[in-house]
UniProtKB/Swiss-Prot annotation:
Keywords: S-adenosyl-L-methionine, Transferase. This is Carboxy-S-adenosyl-L-methionine synthase. One of its GO terms (molecular function) is carboxyl- or carbamoyltransferase activity. S-adenosyl-L-methionine binds at residues 38, 63-65, 88-89, 116-117, 131, 198. It catalyses: prephenate + S-adenosyl-L-methionine = carboxy-S-adenosyl-L-methionine + 3-phenylpyruvate + H2O. It holds the Pfam family Methyltransf_25. It comes from the Bacteria. Belongs to the class I-like SAM-binding methyltransferase superfamily. Cx-SAM synthase family.
Length: 241
């Protein structure tokens, strides 16, 4: 695993965070050291796949990055005639994802596409995964994507939505942000790295509150919506059609 040192030295002109070749190379290390509970979420995605994925259906991993969630789901699917479709708009991520998937043998076919998830059809889905992806979409595009997912899910299908959350209570929000930064420092990131990455993400990652997510999903039509995992200001929800 290549260590993430992308923000370890001062960057004179700090642009917006992008999922380019440099990020793709260090992504597994970056996300493990940056997202509290990430490994637990990936493991649980497999458990949810075992429970919710049905025969003769599709599984979608929207914003699949290097394929961790895709592989976790695939390892735990025991139903026949299931196909997994992973989609990411970063070509470097897609290339590494394909290599990662190919390294593990399975009878379950996986198709990895380089595309914008807003332009991909969702159909005959028993499970859709949005693992820290929705937060990078423009806020005005989120409802349309979630409606498309809902319409493409079969009855009793599940959406797994993992996100960084914002909290309405200012003190709580600041506390959880501080704890997250402390978590990153405990994982070896310097103050400079924490500060520069936060600045790079400011314009590209816009977070919602847990309540905003819940209300939006219920308004779209999901019958059951619940937060099943949270660590600091990161967490994951399930929404069942």
């Amino acid at each position: 695993m290549v260590k993430d040192t992308l923000f370890s030295t001062p960057i004179a002109k700090l642009g917006d965070f992008i999922f380019d070749e440099n990020v793709a190379e260090v992504f597994p290390d970056m996300i493990q050291r940056s997202v509290p509970g990430y490994s637990n979420i990936i493991t649980a995605i497999g458990m949810l796949a075992e429970r919710f994925v049905t025969a003769d259906s599709n599984v979608y991993d929207l914003g699949c990055s290097r394929g961790a969630a895709t592989l976790s789901a695939r390892r735990n699917i025991h139903q026949p005639n299931v196909k997994i479709i992973g989609i990411d708009n970063s070509q470097p991520m897609v290339e590494r994802c394909c290599q990662h998937i190919a390294a593990y043998h399975s009878e379950i076919p996986v198709e990895i596409l380089c595309n914008d998830i807003r332009h991909v059809e969702i159909k005959n889905a028993s499970m859709v995964i949005l693992n820290f992806t929705l937060q990078f979409l423009p806020p005005e595009d989120r409802v349309a994507l979630l409606i498309k997912i809902y319409e493409g899910l079969n009855p009793n299908g599940v959406l797994v939505l993992s996100e960084k959350f914002r909290f309405e209570d200012t003190k709580v929000n600041h506390l959880l942000i501080d704890l997250h930064h402390q978590f990153k420092r405990a994982n070896g990131y310097s103050e400079l790295e924490v500060s520069q990455k936060r600045t790079a993400l400011e314009n590209v990652m816009r977070t919602d509150s847990i309540e905003t997510h819940k209300v939006r999903l219920k308004n779209i039509g999901f019958s059951q919506v619940e937060l099943w995992f949270q660590c600091f200001n990161f967490g994951s929800m399930i929404a069942v059609k």
